[in-house]
Amino acid sequence: MQVNVQSEQRNRCEKKVVVVMPAYNAARTLRMTYADLPHDMVDLVILVDDGSKDETVRIARELGLELFVHNRNYGYGANQKTCYREALRAAADIVVMVHPDYQYDPTLLPQMVAPIESGQADIVFGSRLLGADPMKQGMPWWKYVSNRFLTWVENRAFGLNLSEFHTGYRAYTAEALQSMNLATNSDKFIFDQEVVAQAVTLGLKITEIAVPTRYFPQASSASFLQSSRYGLSILYLVMKYGLHKSGIRRSRQFESLSRRYRIEKRAGLSRAV
């Protein structure tokens, strides 16, 4: 038993795990989120503040987090772009997104990382629909229904069999993040689903683990109107992906950065787009 534990610790030492926190007005929950992280396996915590109006930045500094501050609210997707860029600059091997609003359980980070460490996955989702009934855990019924419907649509469009696409608890290999053309993605909530479309196009392996649902007053949550717009943007993305896959209308958004660089070098250009 001792040999196995030491072996696991050595394996973890070989992988630099960076947690990224896309933050917006997270002052009430940031401390508890950070406290629950398994710090023995996390090498660095990066928080990107997207123009918060509360004390998020001050608390992040007090906690000693690696802090990056946007000068205004650019959006959830823009926040993630900064998160992943800075994580890769920090030489991360594995990047885990943990929302600082405490809606996802930080103590499950070892389970999120395990499929990547074992080579079974390039991307891991924390699914709220794999475990207990999410509505009994506080998810509004209309969010549950829309989540199920959109997940059904995306599974058929992308050829996957996931229980949930709309989770903010995600882990990536550095190679996966580097291969996707993230700069072409939206700065809004649809960013997460664009990442899925890119991952499928590039043949990246996606798996999921069960995580509990947490809904409480301090947790951030999109309104009904925001969720409706989000749903429509997903349907547009699915159509765009279908046109790309069929060859009717190709999109650079779904091409790997390495492939685009090779193509443009052959064309006599010196930079990737």
PLM feature spans:
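Donor nucleotide-sugar binding loop of glycosyltransferases
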Residues: 26-29, 52, 105
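Short beta-strand-to-loop acidic/aromatic patch adjacent to the donor-nucleotide binding site
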Residues: 92-103
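Acceptor/aglycone-binding surface of glycosyltransferases and processive sugar-polymer synthases
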Residues: 70-89, 106-189, 216-228, 232-235
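A short, conserved beta-strand element in the Rossmann-like catalytic core
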Residues: 51, 75, 103
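A conserved acidic beta->alpha catalytic loop
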Residues: 49-57
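Short hydrophobic beta-strand elements that form part
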Residues: 18-22, 69
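Short, well-formed alpha-helical segments that are part of the catalytic scaffolds
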Residues: 24-39
